[in-house]
Amino acid sequence: MHTPEDVAASYARLTAAHGDRFLLGIGVSHAPLIDADNPGRYRKPLAATASFLDGIDATDQPVPVDRRVLAALGPKMLSLAAQRAGGAHPYLVTPDHTHRARAALGDGPLLLPEQTVILTDDADEARKIGKDWLSAYLALPNYANNLLRSGFSADDLAQVSDRLFDAIIAWGDEEAIMRRVSEHVAAGADHVCLQALSADPTAFPRDQWRRLAVAA
């Protein structure tokens, strides 16, 4: 956990060293992670985020509103992102969520969804690489609740159904990945952040990054 003062000071150091290149992402995390060491600490995430932003704004070197984005999924956090930040950076979402997020944010704020990708044409290989990875996130209530709001069923989440897997993880060749990116853009995304998974989760997926860079 970081204090508003720590975050504002780190932002100031980064911009002083590297210019106006850094966009600060702020997220409230998840109850199972926060409460693991301090049970009961995770309460009222919307109010906690607003209070954290108040703290940043009260520092000697506040982070400009347009240089910070919120890890927003639900309508209330998206509304806060529109009011108090430069936009939203949703994680583990579909193009349909991007469409709803754009409607919630309005035309001005940035919308920067994450899209997980696996560069393989083999469905079995894609599922072998991505299913356990996805299962870990489905155990976190914030993501699970957002997917339930998005029309997936409890069975989809419990079984990591093919329908859910294919909606959250884009797999295939570069053309297939770019089609998914285009769907997000058509739904209102300003930028799509690609996270590449590979057979070795401990290795940087440099080959995948290079292939995606050429395709993009």
What are these regions (language model features)?
Residues 1-216:
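Active-site-adjacent structural elements that line small-molecule/cofactor binding pockets in enzymes
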